Amino acid sequence: MQTCYLAVDIGASSGRHIIGTVEHGVMALHEVYRFENRLIEKSGHLCWDMEGLVQNVIEGLKAAHDAGYTPTTVGIDTWAVDFLLLDADGTPIGDPVAYRDGRTAAMREELEPILPFTKLYARTGIQYQSFNTVYQLCALKKEHPEQLAAAEHFLMVPDYLNYRLTGVMANEYTNASTTALVGAISKDWDDEIINRLGLPRKIFGRISTPGTKLGNLSSAVKDYVGFDCAVVLPATHDTGSAFLAVPARDDKAVYLSSGTWSLLGVENKDPITTPASMQANFTNEGGYEYRYRYLKNIMGLWMIQSVRRELGEQTGTRPSFPELIASAQEASSFAGIVSTGDDRFLAPKSMIKEVKAACKDGGKPVPATTGEVMQTIYNSLSHDYQAAIQELQSLTGKEYTSINIVGGGSQDMYLNQMTANATQLPVFAGPTEGTALGNLMVQMIRAGEFKDLADARASIKKSFTILECDPQ
């Protein structure tokens, strides 16, 4: 039987299990399981259904085996910043509150006298986001100090899922770097920051890098799914995995991981933690082989996903993405525009109403139809991509000549064309399953299928269709 590997790729709205194989240097993907991820309201907070996630991860392993696959290894990637605290017995403490919850709204201001953001950025290189792990932990300390007092372990979401599969605890580097508690230079927990914030140092475990074998499936999981395999750490932050799968032609390409979030940037060998970089809110996230993903977080397809969900609730039938794109094309001349980085779009009760209100507040044309709402979102995303690339060129001192888009958003050729037009740069779109591919690439490199990252990236060009949009 052909050797295969399994990527479990979980985003903020859905997860999927994808089998990867490679033959004569050509990779192939086979989706074997898909599930929805959702937020639930609990004790006044927006929380993840963590037990549901664990169950779906395990069910997907079983589905892979039922489909005739026996993976050699499995790797899990998810979104960043969210975490669980565990007690001495390995039992979760409290609820797994999600980054879209509002508990961190005032934390930056409260922490400023203790730890000025200028110092935090200079040490960690991590951009300001209201929901950063550092603010979540401080909000938790304020609301539930007893939970931190009882904690023995801190695990990010993929770390916890790995623990539930193997019984082994580890903090993976790419996700840990997003906490704003890891030194940009040291690549380890920053004791000065942790101590200054009054957080218990003992809960932060040894940091492991992508490619590390964590352990094998526990006996209970193995018996249920019908096989055993090793759990290997990919870049567990989904953006870290997605950036690995960018088949860039040269070092003048901008990377754009397009999903619920749009992460736009480049790979650097060294972090950029200058005051100008801080002012522009660019981040230096840890990557594979200690590369730095120098990028900007942009709201991304979350706004479109929210509009789609809302329309489904109103009518009983969710429109397809092609239908939403077509509605925008019919309103292509509409000039509404908003700032996608505004926190008002993080978790509004109605995205449609919020877009309209933001246009009104900004003195822009207010959309009246679904198509005009969609066109406003497309105008806003393409504008924000263009602005971010201008900032990127200024901060790095380099001129970029193309944009490589990976992830689910790479399928949206209307947005790709608008991005090409706004930036006046050619756009290369694909592969779609960039995150799962990056996850699989780390497993395959570890197994010797590819000699290194350059070899694996060369395989992507041979294995998948990359579409091109030239600026008009």
Regions flagged by a language model, labelled:
Residues 6-7, 19-21, 105, 112-124, ...:
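Active-site core segments that coordinate phosphate-bearing ligands/cofactors
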Residues 191, 197-210:
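A conserved helix-loop-beta module that forms one wall/lid of the active-site cleft
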Residues 42, 62-98, 127-133, 162-183, ...:
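Short beta-strand-loop/turn "lid" adjacent to the catalytic site in phosphate-handling enzymes
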Residues 101:
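Carbohydrate-associated surface elements
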Residues 70-78, 153, 206, 398-407:
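Short glycine-rich phosphate-binding loop at a beta-alpha junction
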Residues 1-94, 122, 150, 222-231, ...:
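N-terminal glycine/serine-rich phosphate-binding loop of ATP-dependent small-molecule kinases
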Residues 46-54, 126, 130, 207-211, ...:
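Short acidic-aromatic active-site loops that bind/stabilize oxyanions
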Residues 77-80, 210-211, 258-261, 402-410:
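Glycine-rich beta-strand-to-loop/alpha-helix junction loops that act as flexible
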